[in-house]
């Protein structure tokens, strides 16, 4: 069974035709949801002022493509899976506001179309 990180790497690698054997580095920081997520998902909602644990993935090829995959947690709860693209837009495969899922396309991570 692949970890969430492995599933995300597999998905992004295939989506953007990246080298399969390239090592990814991970940067982990804590940041307030309001500073990370687009306003419409945070403003006046349950994520306001919540501290998120962010895991952002890097490699030479990802950097050249300006693609930054990420996984976000609040405490132990999964909040978001996705990537930031070359236009600095956040594309989500999964987004949860701590109370209910706003978007769930995790089936894409396990090879579904």
Describe the residue ranges of each PLM region:
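Mixed-charge, Lys/Arg-enriched low-complexity segments
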Residues: 2-22, 86-113
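Acidic, low-complexity, intrinsically disordered interaction modules
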Residues: 32-102
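Negatively charged, low-complexity tracts enriched in Asp/Glu with abundant Ser/Thr
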Residues: 2-49
